[in-house]
Amino acid sequence: MPATILIGAQWGDEGKGKATDLLAKDIDYVVKFNGGNNAGHTVVIGGDKYVLHLLPSGILNENVVPVIANGVVINPEVLFDEIATLNSRGVNTDKLVISANAHIIAPFHRTIDLVTERFLGKRQLGTTGRGIGPTYADKINRIGIRVQDLFDKSVLRQKIEGSLSNKNHMLVKVFNRRSVSVTEMLDYLLSFAERMRPMIADTSLLLNNALDCGKHVLFEGGQATMLDVDHGSYPFVTSSNATVGGAITGAGIGPTRVNKVIGVAKSYTTRVGAGPFPTELHDEYGEWLQKRGYEVGATTGRKRRCGWFDGVVARYATRINGITDYVLTKLDVLTGLDRIPICVGYKVGDSVFREMPVSQSDFHHAVPIYEDLPGWQCNISECESFDSLPPEARGYVLALEDLIKARISVIGTGPERENIIIRHPLGIF
């Protein structure tokens, strides 16, 4: 049975959690394949808000098996804190499965992340300080600590010693910090081993067997296309592949398994942290979007930078990921505007770009080319069909659809679970 991949089409915070929750009734497995606790998924169910940083959003559906695959980096302390929080609210987490090959975020990874970011000064990347980058760096440098290492004390000690050999030197000599004790770190990580043991599996085998048996599998991307380490606005990116290729390698499935790629985009654009953002607004409209959209990072608590919809970015996401369908979120936030600009291209010096510039220097200096569309004034949160939307809202959706070169199948019209319009049944399976 083919699989479906869900991808953020902008800079994250597009509403992927709500999209996953929407699809959960039709799926058997939800798989997190990249990142760690450096992003937050927010889902509102019956007026109750759930914010997940590490666990897959599908864990809120009791019929779904949530999987943390090999491409994820795991802070075990955060893992058990999230599990405890959900359990206290009546959510059953017993079905959670974790890859033995996922990498572990240790406290020293977080320390390295924070002191390195401070050391960069004005060149800071705006990381979340959760230790994600240093953990992936250890993975690439082949000195990482994997989940399976927690169950062999001698191997774990060797891995910790290997990882700390250069870090302690850097902490002491460069950052004037104290060195990290191998024994203390060993005891700390071993304290999680037995609690994690029942959750551990070969998740690649599990998922491929599930697909062979006709089970429905959804791969839920963390972060988004423009934060992808290869295809995003480098170096202001995350440390993993947040595009469709990341699902293949980050979960251990073959590309022929994939049937549909669903992109999630806001009806406007937001970004957290440093980096280029051509349509960013520094005026009352930017403030208006931030307040109306409650644009505060679920992980960092930082106000999100806000701007108009960027068609160049979304069309780029369509191309990079092979997106077949879009979920367009937060259309209701735009209610009340007399006019709504959308970015259809960039101007850099005397050059005009209709597609994403390959040069990051050009992207940094890109000036958006806007087309204005008429706004609407009426409340759309209770609209149940595309035809029941005001004509201006329908026109806005159709204009975006033409711009991004993929159909917009689902439209979010409010924060609640039921505030959606199914324009085209996704038919994901």
UniProtKB/Swiss-Prot annotation:
Disulfide bonds: none annotated. SUPFAM superfamilies: P-loop containing nucleoside triphosphate hydrolases. The keyword Metal-binding applies. One of its GO terms (molecular function) is GTP binding. Substrate binds at residues 298-304. Binds 1 Mg(2+) ion per subunit. Its cofactor is Mg(2+). It is found in: Cytoplasm. Mg(2+) binds at residues 13, 40. The active site is at residues 13, 41. It catalyses: IMP + L-aspartate + GTP = N(6)-(1,2-dicarboxyethyl)-AMP + GDP + phosphate + 2 H(+). It holds the Pfam family Adenylsucc_synt. GO terms for cellular component: cytoplasm. Pathway: Purine metabolism; AMP biosynthesis via de novo pathway; AMP from IMP: step 1/2. GO terms for biological process: 'de novo' AMP biosynthetic process; IMP metabolic process. GTP binds at residues 12-18, 40-42, 304, 330-332, 412-414. Its EC number is 6.3.4.4. It comes from the Bacteria. IMP binds at residues 13-16, 38-41, 128, 142, 223, 238, 302. Keywords: Cytoplasm, GTP-binding, Ligase, Magnesium, Metal-binding, Nucleotide-binding, Purine biosynthesis. Homodimer. Plays an important role in the de novo pathway of purine nucleotide biosynthesis. Catalyzes the first committed step in the biosynthesis of AMP from IMP. This is Adenylosuccinate synthetase. It comes from Tropheryma whipplei (strain Twist) (Whipple's bacillus).
